């Protein structure tokens, strides 16, 4: 497996290495043109994105734990690169020096939004503040990975005691879930079980049972497969919220909701909360019908 891990790591980091190589080409270029700066910057983003996409996918779906762990390490390296890039003053200055006044609307928009995102990230803050922001982003990446890992590895099971209750499910699904020695059919919260079961099973009670099990993953409470139960995700979530609040405060926002929505159509945390309240009022009557 060591050889497979190394091969995957090399493949996963190929895009990142290309992105890292493009950085000096951009900031050291004497020609501050759209092609030399924005074009290469776009190539840099695409290269890093390729590594990030591969790492994110394989960390969740690869059957080998060693490869999943290698993918998470790759993801951390890409995230570290993104964090440094977002606070890279030399890159910001190179991008800001490009004259896009005669460019098409799409190029002007890309340029304006890129500079805006740099300022939102804190590129104009003192060096020590930027260093703290980078540290926060790195910690948030690790915490988010831990949060996702806890959920993905917390596989729950429901038991079906009568094959007739599998009515509605495709024949191949039923055939792949024979009864065990005790006569019970076991359905897990893994996606190959969960998605078809929730889509096709006629038995409302079983679908409710599986849905609750699926949504309870990572809560740290004992369950059928919970021989070794940790504290779940509560502590991790608290750490994430604490760091998000610190980052928002450093960047001049009252809270994380205001920061994360500032560049969105909704515009602020208060507006987002108002929207959710309106949706809740409209949806509540129909939702209540499901309970009666």
Regions found by a protein language model. Name each.
Residues 1-292:
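Zn2+-dependent metallopeptidase catalytic domains
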């Amino acid at each position: 497996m060591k050889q497979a891990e190394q091969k995957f790591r090399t493949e996963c980091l190929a895009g990142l290495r290309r992105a890292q190589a493009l950085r000096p080409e951009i900031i050291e270029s004497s020609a501050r043109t759209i092609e030399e700066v924005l074009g290469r910057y776009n190539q840099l983003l695409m290269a890093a994105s390729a590594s990030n996409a591969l790492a994110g996918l394989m960390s969740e779906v690869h059957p080998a734990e060693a490869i999943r762990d290698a993918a998470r390490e790759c993801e951390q390296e890409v995230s570290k690169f993104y964090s440094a890039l977002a606070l890279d003053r030399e890159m910001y200055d190179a991008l800001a020096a490009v004259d896009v006044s005669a460019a098409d609307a799409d190029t002007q928009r890309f340029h304006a939004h890129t500079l805006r995102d740099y300022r939102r990230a804190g590129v104009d803050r003192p060096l020590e503040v930027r260093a703290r922001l980078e540290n926060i982003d790195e910690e948030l990446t690790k915490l988010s990975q831990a949060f996702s890992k806890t959920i993905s590895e917390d596989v729950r099971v429901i038991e079906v005691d009568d094959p007739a209750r599998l009515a509605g499910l495709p024949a191949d699904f039923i055939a792949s879930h024979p009864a065990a020695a005790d006569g019970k059919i076991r359905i897990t919260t893994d996606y190959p079980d969960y998605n078809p079961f929730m889509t096709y099973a006629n038995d409302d009670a079983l679908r409710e049972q599986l849905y609750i099990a699926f949504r309870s993953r990572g809560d740290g409470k004992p369950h059928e497969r919970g021989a070794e139960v940790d504290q779940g995700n509560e502590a991790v979530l608290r750490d994430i919220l604490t760091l998000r609040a610190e980052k928002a405060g450093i960047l001049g926002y009252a809270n994380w909701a205001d920061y994360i929505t500032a560049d969105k159509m909704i515009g602020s945390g208060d507006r987002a909360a108002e929207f959710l309240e309106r949706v809740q009022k409209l949806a509540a009557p129909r939702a209540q019908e499901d309970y009666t």
